[in-house]
């Protein structure tokens, strides 16, 4: 992949463009045009909890290979996800994902009882492999998913915001009761800028910028495949 000609700012512009292009892909269009039923919302909620777990795995690998100061930056990001913000009464995001399932009629046991999608498992493995690449590729592969979920960067709203609006429309569940979705609508705006913080110091060569673009592009490719598997799963369930 070739970098854009305008250095770091040009690279950032390209990354934002790539994130917006996700929503023009067939898998994303299928997913955001789904009609949610209770059964579909339940299965989607369960699979997204597995997705959150995979994000924690991947960021752990990224942190392990990154320079010390970037390890600290990643930990600041992951502290919200793994521990929450106790001072604000906010729980970790795995707990939030399970608790959000309650509004769809799920118990905590349902998250343990239901298996991961086979296609989802393959995508999770692919993301872990990306997280084990050179650290710039690896951090881009994980951070680009935060950018793709930032309402500040995505025209028409982030994926979390769109899904939340669909659930409110189809099931009458307000966003404030979708506690995990609502949290990501807010937090991923903040987290989306992590990659630019890294790039300002470390993406000072074309090789480094190309590594970031490559890691991001491959992660978004996996993301499209994963959303396609989610759309497939939802389509197998009754639409009424």
Question: What positions do the PLM features span?
Answer:
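Acidic, carboxylate-rich catalytic segments that either coordinate divalent cations
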Residues: 2, 203-240
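Acidic, low-complexity proline/glycine-rich segments
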Residues: 2-28
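Active-site-proximal alpha-helical scaffolds that flank and shape metal-associated catalytic sites
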Residues: 6-11, 72-180, 221, 225, ...
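Alpha-helical bundle segments that constitute or directly flank the non-heme di-iron/ferroxidase center
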Residues: 16-23, 32, 36-65, 137-161, ...
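Short, charged/polar, low-complexity loop and linker segments
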Residues: 28-33, 169-171, 203-204
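Amphipathic alpha-helical segments within well-ordered protein domains
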Residues: 59-63, 98, 164-168, 196, ...
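Structural helix-adjacent loops and short alpha-helical linkers that scaffold large soluble proteins
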Residues: 67, 71, 108, 203-210
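Accessory, usually C-terminal, subdomains that scaffold auxiliary metal cofactors
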Residues: 173-216
């Amino acid at each position: 992949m070739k970098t854009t000609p305008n250095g770091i700012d040009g690279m950032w512009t390209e990354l934002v463009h790539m994130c917006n292009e996700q929503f023009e892909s067939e898998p994303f269009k299928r997913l955001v045009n789904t009609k949610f039923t209770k059964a579909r919302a339940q299965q989607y909620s369960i699979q997204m909890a597995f997705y959150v777990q995979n994000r924690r795995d991947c960021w752990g690998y990224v942190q392990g290979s990154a320079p010390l100061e970037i390890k600290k930056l990643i930990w600041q990001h992951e502290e919200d996800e793994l521990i929450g913000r106790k001072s604000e009464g906010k729980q970790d995001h795995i707990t939030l994902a399970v608790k959000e399932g309650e509004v769809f009629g799920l118990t905590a046991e349902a998250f343990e009882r239901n298996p991961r999608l086979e296609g989802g498992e393959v995508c999770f493995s692919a993301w872990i492999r990306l997280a084990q690449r050179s650290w710039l590729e690896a951090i881009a592969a994980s951070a680009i998913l935060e950018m793709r979920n930032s309402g500040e960067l995505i025209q028409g709203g982030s994926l979390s915001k769109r899904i939340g609006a669909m659930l409110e429309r189809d099931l009458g569940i307000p966003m404030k009761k979708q506690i995990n979705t609502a949290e990501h609508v807010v937090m991923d705006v903040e987290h989306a800028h992590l990659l630019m913080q890294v790039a300002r110091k470390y993406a000072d060569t074309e090789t480094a910028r190309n590594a970031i673009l490559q890691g991001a592009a491959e992660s978004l490719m996996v993301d499209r495949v994963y959303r396609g598997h989610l759309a497939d799963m939802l389509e197998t369930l009754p639409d009424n």
